[in-house]
């Protein structure tokens, strides 16, 4: 597999420290609010990457943190702890907020068919690990105590900016939140490893440390958790591109200074989900959730399909029209799969090889999910029996996670019910094999039969808005997409 490496700005063959095993780390959510669908784009693509690695035979140990302390409203170690901010907003304790939004996050992940990582570790559970790392950094001169806090000294590094393609507004992290500069820092880019009560008197969560009662900085949490569960050598670090600087930059600085050797060679960054007003952001108060998509009638897997249609290193523009187009494409795909007969032939493994190779090449080409999706249509057009097509689609869906066969089976059952009801009424529906549309056409007929013409006209207009044209014929109706 060849992946783009954000640290080298090149595509290269993905290699691991231990052959056949991948130590993978994912920056998890700060659980002070619901995850928005921009956040979840990153987790969808990281999920596909993990599944692709497993598909290729790797033993993957994927670790994710849950940030429940220490992430301030500015990435420059200023502002209020986001967890405290969330607790105040909802008049609850920090731990109540953390548990509620952690549960909500994983509920969203389940709906999006995102596999739960092998290890999920709240930041508050590894305080001893952070203190151990900070003590060594102090002893070796990489950290200093000032104003009641412990800072990492970036001037000790030969090279600090690892990801030099970050945005200018990311460099001005202390400015963009409208907060005061931290005057205790020796250098502009120094960052806090440990806060004490001298920083925030109202901090809810505090622990004893050699430097006084306090709490860890955001960046040290990921290093400590990864070293505990992934070991000294991390193969693959994932996250949103907005975390490249300063968060991932600081992780590298403190981890390699502590370990005395290179830490993680491969960095996988997923780009932004943008709206008409720019990057989706909780801090701006403008964000969409999975629950909102569901309220508007979208299966969350439509959003997953939407994400997979674009490459992870390209900014993805979200509009309702774009999501509608993804829904139409997904529904058509499911309808075509539903039309396959699982009893038509037996699975022919030999005939799968060419398309399996094409699918594999798409994954190996920097996780080209849009190309991988085209292989689904190649399967449907291939000269092979239906049983083999279904087996191949199921094989590819181990990576894509689109629930293709289960959704197709549900559509078959729905179609059977509609056909049964249509037959019982003597009404013949001819269309493109979409049971949801068939059901609406039948409902329109029943409304007309009951002389509820307003309801019948409303259904016709709703179908037309979806691009469906219905023509009444003797003994039934014919519908088509226009």
Predicted feature residues:
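Alpha-helical recognition segments enriched in aromatics with Gly/Pro capping
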Residues: 1-32, 47, 106-107, 127-339
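N-terminal, positively charged nucleic-acid-binding surface of large information/translation enzymes
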Residues: 8-11, 17-113, 470, 475-479
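Anion (oxyanion) recognition and catalysis
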Residues: 54, 138, 464
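Short, well-structured beta-strand/strand-turn elements
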Residues: 59-61, 141-147, 383, 469-471
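Short, glycine/charge-rich beta-strand/loop segments that flank catalytic centers
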Residues: 63-70, 98-105, 115-130, 148-157
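Non-catalytic interaction-recognition regions
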Residues: 92-96, 106-132, 142, 244, ...
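Structural preference for alpha-helix termini/caps and helix-kink/transition segments
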Residues: 279-281, 287-482
């Amino acid at each position: 597999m060849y992946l783009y490496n954000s640290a080298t700005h090149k595509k290269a063959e993905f290699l691991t420290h231990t052959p056949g095993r991948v130590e993978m780390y994912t920056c998890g959510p700060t659980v002070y609010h619901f995850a928005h669908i921009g956040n979840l784009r990153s987790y969808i693509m990281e999920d596909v990457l993990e599944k692709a690695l497993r598909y290729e035979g790797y033993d993957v140990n994927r670790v994710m943190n849950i940030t429940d302390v220490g992430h301030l409203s500015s990435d420059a170690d200023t502002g209020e702890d986001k967890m405290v901010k969330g607790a105040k907003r909802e008049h609850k304790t920090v731990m109540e907020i953390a548990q509620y939004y952690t549960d909500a996050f994983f509920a969203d992940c389940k709906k999006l068919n995102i596999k739960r990582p092998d290890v999920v570790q709240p930041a508050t559970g590894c305080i001893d690990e952070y203190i151990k790392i900070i003590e060594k950094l102090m002893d070796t001169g990489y950290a200093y105590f000032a104003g009641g806090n412990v800072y990492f000294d970036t001037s000790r590094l030969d090279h600090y900016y690892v990801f030099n393609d970050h945005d200018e507004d990311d460099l001005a992290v202390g400015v963009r939140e409208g907060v005061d500069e931290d005057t205790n820092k020796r250098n502009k880019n120094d960052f806090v490893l440990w806060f004490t009560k001298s920083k925030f008197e109202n901090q809810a969560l505090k622990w004893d440390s050699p430097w006084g009662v306090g709490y860890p900085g955001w960046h040290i949490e990921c290093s400590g958790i990864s070293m505990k569960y992934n070991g000294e050598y991390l193969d693959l670090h994932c996250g949103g591109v907005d975390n490249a600087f300063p968060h991932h930059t600081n992780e590298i600085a403190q981890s390699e200074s502590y370990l005395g050797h290179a830490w993680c060679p491969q960095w996988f960054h997923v780009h932004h989900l943008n709206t008409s007003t720019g990057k989706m952001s909780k801090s701006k108060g403008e964000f969409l959730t999975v629950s909102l998509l569901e309220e508007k009638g979208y299966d969350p897997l439509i959003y997953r399909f939407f994400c997979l249609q674009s490459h992870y290193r390209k900014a993805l523009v979200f509009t309702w029209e774009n999501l509608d187009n993804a829904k139409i494409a997904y529904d058509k795909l499911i309808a075509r799969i539903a039309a396959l007969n699982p009893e038509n032939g037996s699975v022919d493994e030999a005939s799968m090889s060419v398309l399996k190779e094409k699918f594999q090449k798409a994954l190996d080409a920097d996780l080209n999910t849009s190309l991988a999706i085209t292989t689904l249509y190649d399967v449907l057009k291939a000269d092979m029996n239906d049983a083999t097509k279904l087996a191949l689609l199921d094989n590819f869906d181990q990576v894509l996670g689109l629930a293709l066969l289960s959704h197709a089976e549900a559509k078959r059952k729905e179609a059977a019910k509609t056909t049964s009801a249509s037959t019982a009424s003597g009404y013949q529906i001819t269309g493109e094999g979409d049971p949801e549309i068939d059901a609406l056409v039948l409902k329109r007929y029943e409304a007309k039969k009951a002389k509820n013409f307003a309801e019948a006209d409303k259904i016709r207009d709703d179908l037309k808005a979806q691009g469906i044209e219905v023509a009444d014929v003797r003994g039934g109706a014919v519908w088509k997409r226009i």
